[in-house]
Regions:
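Short, conserved turn/kink motifs that form compact alpha/beta structural patches or helix kinks used as
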Residues: 2-9, 22-27, 31-140
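Intrinsically disordered, non-coiled, low-complexity regulatory regions enriched in serine, threonine
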Residues: 12-15
């Protein structure tokens, strides 16, 4: 006789109302494609989209090194499972650019979670050029 498993099934939209209660609109830059140029540098192509979710601060950490001290700002982002977020995507918040470092698949309640780290645009020239283009400061 086949064994019967007692898995519970919950509607994946169960927490959508709760998420919506604490959500705001954010700009997200999604990595469309990656290429390697002749010099061996990775060149990314971004597209600008909107995402709705809840951004929670995880605090600031001081990183000390011989090259100089820096502060790292970390955030967690929660949104509906409908959104597809991947490592490398960047969310804009108060003129800060937060790079997705890790993504957790949505849970049985339909919540998707990812961890973010604030980055400097000087380290992401492709994105910096794209943002200047969107603002009209740079022509293609």
């Amino acid at each position: 006789m086949a064994e019967i498993y007692q898995n519970h099934v919950i509607d994946p939209t169960y927490f959508y109302d709760c998420i919506e209660e604490f959500s705001f609109n954010y700009t997200i830059y999604v990595v469309e494609k990656k290429e390697i140029d002749a010099s061996g540098n990775v060149k990314r192509t971004y597209s600008k989209n909107a995402i709705r979710g809840s951004l929670q601060s995880q605090g600031v950490e001081l990183r000390q090194s011989k090259d100089g001290n820096t502060k790292e700002m970390r955030y967690n982002f929660y949104c509906k499972s409908l959104y597809r977020i991947d490592i490398g995507d960047i969310i804009e918040y108060k003129n800060r650019y937060l790079r997705v470092e890790s993504v957790k698949d949505f849970d049985e309640y339909g919540v998707r979670e990812c961890s973010l780290l604030m980055v400097q645009l000087t380290k992401y020239r492709d994105l910096a050029d794209y943002i200047k283009y969107l603002q009209g400061a740079k022509l293609v």
